[in-house]
Structure formats: structure tokens, C-alpha cells
């Protein structure tokens, strides 16, 4: 039976959630906290609003996770020197350790998923997914 794109994306998402929740439990993180850490690590100094906009996630949800991560000592919040209303987010040393573990686990998962695909197929897949996500 052929599946449509939504079914395939759903299958991949649920599979990834199961995988992620397994290794995140050992790190003491929730999935949503790991998403915030990953985005700060990839773009230090990003704001809460920047993460919310990038991921199409509610600002309040990001704010809750930022508060938890700050309380847990994984991130620092610094006010922008030019605009005190802007709060930039940075990983602490412990936050960087968690980021590296998350990134390594994600890299391993992608390597497993990409087995049997050619570099051209992988490139095409990533290009098409980026184009679709840009339309949202």
C-alpha cells in the first residue's frame, strides 16, 4: 500500500520521538527541552522569539522550556546591550555537553535512516523537505 507524504512524515516523526525519548531520558531532558538546546547550540545568541518563529512553535511553550533550562543551569539569558527587551540565549558548559550528546545521537539516527540511499538521493530529500518547510 502506498502512503502519502503526511503518513510518511508521521511515521518518521513518531519513530524519531521514540528514539529521542530513549536517549533523552538518560540525559534528564524532555524532547521539547532538547529542541531548545539544539537551536541555541546551532545559533548562539538566538532569542526565544527567534526559536518560536523558526520552529512555528508557540512563544509561551518556548518560554516555559527556557525557564526550566535556565533553572537547571543549562542555559544563560543575557540582555542585549542595544535593546534591553531582547534576551539572548546561550548554553552553559553543561548545556554544551548536552548539546553534543543530542547532536551525536541525531547524527547516528540519520546515518541509520540514510543507509541504502545515494548521496544524490539524500541531497534531493533534504532540498525538497527544506522547500516544503519554507512554505509553512
Model-derived regions, located:
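N-terminal leader segment of winged-helix/HTH proteins
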Residues: 1-27
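Residue-level detection of the helix-turn-helix DNA-binding "recognition helix"
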Residues: 25, 41, 56, 67, ...
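The alpha-helix within a helix-turn-helix
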Residues: 52
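Residues within helix-turn-helix
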Residues: 48-49, 60, 67, 87
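Charged, amphipathic alpha-helical coiled-coil/dimerization segments
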Residues: 17, 67-127
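Short alpha-helical "packing" element that flanks the helix-turn-helix/winged-helix DNA-binding module
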Residues: 36-37
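Short helix-coil-helix linker/hinge
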Residues: 27-33, 61, 92, 118
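Short capping segments at the starts of secondary-structure elements
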Residues: 43-47
Amino acid at each position: 500500500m502506498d502512503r502519502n507524504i503526511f503518513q510518511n512524515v508521521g511515521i518518521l516523526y513518531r519513530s524519531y520521538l521514540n528514539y529521542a525519548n530513549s536517549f533523552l531520558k538518560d540525559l534528564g531532558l524532555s524532547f521539547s527541552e532538547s529542541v531548545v538546546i539544539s537551536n541555541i547550540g546551532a545559533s548562539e545568541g538566538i532569542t526565544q522569539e527567534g526559536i518560536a518563529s523558526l520552529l512555528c512553535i508557540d512563544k509561551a511553550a518556548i518560554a516555559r522550556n527556557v525557564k526550566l533550562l535556565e533553572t537547571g543551569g543549562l542555559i544563560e539569558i543575557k540582555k542585549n546591550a542595544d535593546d534591553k527587551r531582547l534576551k539572548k540565549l546561550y548554553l552553559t558548559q553543561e548545556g554544551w555537553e548536552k548539546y553534543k550528546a543530542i547532536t551525536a545521537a541525531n547524527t547516528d539516527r540519520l546515518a541509520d535512516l540514510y543507509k541504502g540511499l545515494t548521496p544524490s538521493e539524500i541531497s534531493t530529500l533534504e532540498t525538497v523537505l527544506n522547500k516544503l518547510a519554507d512554505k509553512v
